[in-house]
């Protein structure tokens, strides 16, 4: 297995995005693109990527705008860009996959999957709507969907905050809209990220990294809420390729997915939109970061076996919706 790092230009036209690829020996059994979550970076998935590469799956991912080593020239962390920059981040996912398919020499018939975690799962769901039929299957980890009324309230509140403080600012409201009362079920709290993982070592490593954590900007939360509104729209969901399989994975104690209830809402919405192959699994005892919990090897294996079982879907990638 070989790991390479390089950069490519974001759709914002100015930011070089850090990209990583984990390359097994050819022929590849499949390929997987990773879309990471809020306040983290793609190398947090190194152990998972090496596991898959050891089984013949090529893995590639990049740091989203304002994350990891993909901070724009103006130096603002956890900021995608001005209003509408959600579009850039979704475009980057599509463009990077096209680039990777060429770089890695992925042959026609080799299935290409997309995995999105947390914020990355919201971006992946936007990608499914905007670029239907371009991946063979999607894995959504730590996803959810706030009720429409709560989302509308959040959008109105963050618009006022942006006008008052500026989109590059941080505020208590923006942080509350990002993380809500996630830590409340886990009182007494050891850290502000107890909701993220039952694995204390994982949280401590996260907190010690200068590339992880931090308060999201008002502008990023504005873009995230806009994206959530898009992916919660029944009309938009009907644009997805209904033949491409989707796997929803979450910890039973993940507050982002409303302890499983929000994940089930997403599953129902997909089925109502006509998706033919939607599966869901909840892991007892696990919180938000199922790929970093103590029993993560079971999650790794489930993802690999699911991809293996859907390898025959490669012919559907260019299929109609």
Protein language model regions, located:
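Alpha/beta-hydrolase active-site loop
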Residues: 81-103
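Alpha/beta-hydrolase fold nucleophile elbow
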Residues: 104-118
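Active-site glycine-rich loops that stabilize anionic/oxyanionic intermediates
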Residues: 35-40, 118-119, 252-253
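N-terminal cap/lid segment of alpha/beta-hydrolase-fold proteins
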Residues: 1-24
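Short beta-strand/loop motif that positions the catalytic acidic residue
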Residues: 248-250
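Conserved alpha/beta-hydrolase
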Residues: 44-75
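Catalytic active-site module of serine/aspartate enzymes centered on a nucleophile-bearing elbow/loop
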Residues: 271-321
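Alpha/beta-hydrolase-fold enzymes
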Residues: 124-211
């Amino acid at each position: 297995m070989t790991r390479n790092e390089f950069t490519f230009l974001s759709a914002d036209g100015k930011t070089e995005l850090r990209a990583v690829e984990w390359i097994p020996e050819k022929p590849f059994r499949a390929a997987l693109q990773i879309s990471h979550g809020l306040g983290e970076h793609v190398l947090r998935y190194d152990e998972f990527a090496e596991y898959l590469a050891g089984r013949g799956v090529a893995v590639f991912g990049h740091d989203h705008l304002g994350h990891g080593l993909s901070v724009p020239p103006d130096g603002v962390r956890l900021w995608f860009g001005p209003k509408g920059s959600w579009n850039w981040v979704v475009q980057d996912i599509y463009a990077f996959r096209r680039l990777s398919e060429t770089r890695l020499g992925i042959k026609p018939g080799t299935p290409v999957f997309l995995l999105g975690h947390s914020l990355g799962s919201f971006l992946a769901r936007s990608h499914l709507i905007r670029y239907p039929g371009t991946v063979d299957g999607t894995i959504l980890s730590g996803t959810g969907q706030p009720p429409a009324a709560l989302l509308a309230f959040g959008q109105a509140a963050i618009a006022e905050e942006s006008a008052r403080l500026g989109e590059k600012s941080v505020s208590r409201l923006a942080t509350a809209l990002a993380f809500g009362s996630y830590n409340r079920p886990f009182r007494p709290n050891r850290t502000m990220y107890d909701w993220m993982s039952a694995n204390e070592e994982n949280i401590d490593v996260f907190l010690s990294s200068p590339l992880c954590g931090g308060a999201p900007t008002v502008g990023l939360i504005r873009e995230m809420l806009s994206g959530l509104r898009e992916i919660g729209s029944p009309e938009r969901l009907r644009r997805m390729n209904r033949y491409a399989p989707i796997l929803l994975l979450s910890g039973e104690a993940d507050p982002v997915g409303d302890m499983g209830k929000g994940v089930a809402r997403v599953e129902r919405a997909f089925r109502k939109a006509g998706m033919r192959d939607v599966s869901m699994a909840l892991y007892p005892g696990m919180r938000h970061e199922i790929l970093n919990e103590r029993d993560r090897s079971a999650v790794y294996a489930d993802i690999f076996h699911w991809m293996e079982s859907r390898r025959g879907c490669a012919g559907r990638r260019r299929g109609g919706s």
